[in-house]
Swiss-Prot record:
Pathway: Cofactor biosynthesis; coenzyme A biosynthesis; CoA from (R)-pantothenate: step 1/5
Entry's family note: Belongs to the type III pantothenate kinase family.
GO molecular function, one term: metal ion binding
An example Gene Ontology CC term for this record: cytoplasm
Function: Catalyzes the phosphorylation of pantothenate (Pan), the first step in CoA biosynthesis.
The protein's name: Type III pantothenate kinase
InterPro entries: ATPase_NBD (IPR043129), Type_III_PanK (IPR004619)
Cofactor or coenzyme needed: NH4(+); K(+)
Amino acid sequence: MILELDCGNSFIKWRIITKSCSTLVSGGVVDSDTALLECLGNLSGAAFSDCRLVSVRSAEETAKLVCALADTFSISPVCAAPAPELAGVINGYDDFARLGLDRWLAFVGAYHLVKGACLVIDLGTAITSDFVEASGKHLGGFICPGMPLMRNQLRTHTRRIRYDDAEAEKALVRLVPGRATAEAVERGCSLMLRGFAMTQIEIAREYWGDDFAIFVTGGDAVLVADVLPGARIVPDLVFVGLALACPLR
């Protein structure tokens, strides 16, 4: 079996799949290397012999995790690396190595699934969007703060904005004007996400009319799903691209 890791800025997403047909065996999300090692160590009946990962962390942090995995599980993790082209997709950045690896793999994965023009929106700590032509040419994209960053900035820099996660979750049940601070902040940030997503659709239509696919991924994908009719919600889109970047025999 294969262990796959998506090491983001805030969390590590992991899953174990079969080597023969990529069937999902187990998976989860943790907030630290220690939690990952503990979680994997407690699994029963899910032994893995191979590992591939993508990381947007520093080289030092990534190397530390790779060493820990090698020491603990006697595996040799294969790490995704920047590339000017992959699986028919041409990296659109002027300096291809500066494009975030998780972002790169997400839209490579999306293009692989449809072999046509696509818009990919990833809603995580940050929000990213990317546009890929039917030819595989990446036209570029946008980056803006995600829900966690917007929320935390307001909590950090505005003294009277204080509320807990339970209040935040309750506030998002509806999107009418808020009558409490948590409602006003959470709903306002949610509307900004939705507005961003709808603007991406408008831009994509300027390029391709209605002849394109929409992919949405990331932890907050559910917050925009209803304003993106026909969008494909693919939580593991980065892993689709990771398999293309790091094929294991």
